[in-house]
């Protein structure tokens, strides 16, 4: 497999904007045509920097919505490996421990790689590796309600901590970094991950890129 046979799609937008849903929909529908081993999803969250050397008190103070919290250099390196036909060991991140864990996920080269994450489009080096990019333009109040429900139910968070983080970093960093990165998207998707027309447009674009 050479670099021309690996299509990389980036899906960005606010936390809980529908990125994972549209990524899963594309994955489920394309794998029927390509085969499960020929399409993969990489979550930008896996590349939060290792904080195992820090105390839990220090870890919870990290601004996870700032580009500096992420190791985009490692993500770029892994994408280049995969495009070159080489496997990559994707890190795993624990939302409860606020750091990476020792396990990794061994990813073999794919025909299609779907990236999803809040800050993907803020990094020009990452953008250069993408064949197409998407921004989920979901209203921020809807994103907040989804995030609150998800983090309390799935990430062992308290309602108070989620609200505090939203006020302190999530909303300000969205306005400073994430929303301005919308200008770099090839496709802007309103109404969240259940937008069927947008999903079909993205699928058609991927199929066109694969046919080149």
Curated annotation (Swiss-Prot):
The keyword ATP-binding applies. GO terms for biological process: CTP salvage; UMP salvage. One of its GO terms (molecular function) is ATP binding. Its EC number is 2.7.1.48. The keyword Mitochondrion does not apply. It is found in: Cytoplasm. Keywords: ATP-binding, Cytoplasm, Kinase, Nucleotide-binding, Transferase. ATP binds at residues 13-20. It catalyses: uridine + ATP = UMP + ADP + H(+); cytidine + ATP = CMP + ADP + H(+). Gene3D superfamilies: P-loop containing nucleotide triphosphate hydrolases. InterPro entries: P-loop_NTPase, PRK/URK, Uridine_kinase, Uridine_kinase-like. Pathway: Pyrimidine metabolism; CTP biosynthesis via salvage pathway; CTP from cytidine: step 1/3; Pyrimidine metabolism; UMP biosynthesis via salvage pathway; UMP from uridine: step 1/1. It comes from the Bacteria. GO terms for cellular component: cytoplasm. Belongs to the uridine kinase family. PANTHER family: URIDINE KINASE (PTHR10285). This is Uridine kinase. It comes from Shewanella denitrificans (strain OS217 / ATCC BAA-1090 / DSM 15013).
């Amino acid at each position: 497999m050479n670099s021309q046979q690996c299509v990389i799609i980036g899906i960005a937008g606010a936390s809980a904007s529908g990125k994972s849903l549209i990524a899963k929909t594309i994955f489920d529908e394309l794998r029927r045509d390509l085969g499960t081993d020929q399409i993969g999803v990489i979550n930008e969250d896996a590349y939060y920097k290792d904080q195992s050397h820090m105390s839990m008190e220090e870890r919870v103070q990290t601004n996870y919505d700032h580009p500096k919290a992420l190791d985009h250099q490692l993500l770029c390196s892994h994408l280049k490996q995969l495009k070159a036909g080489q496997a990559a060991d994707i890190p795993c991140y624990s939302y409860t421990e606020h750091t990476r864990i020792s396990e990794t996920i061994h990813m073999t080269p794919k025909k299609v790689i779907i990236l999803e994450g809040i800050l993907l489009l803020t990094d020009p080096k990452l953008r250069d590796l993408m064949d197409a990019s998407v921004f989920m333009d979901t209203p921020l109040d809807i994103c907040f309600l989804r995030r609150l429900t998800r983090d309390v139910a799935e990430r062992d968070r308290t309602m108070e901590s989620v609200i505090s983080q939203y006020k302190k970093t999530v909303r300000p960093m969205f306005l400073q970094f994430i929303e301005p990165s919308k200008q770099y998207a090839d496709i802007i998707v309103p109404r969240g991950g259940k937008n069927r027309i947008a999903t079909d447009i993205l699928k058609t674009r991927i199929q066109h890129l694969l046919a080149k």
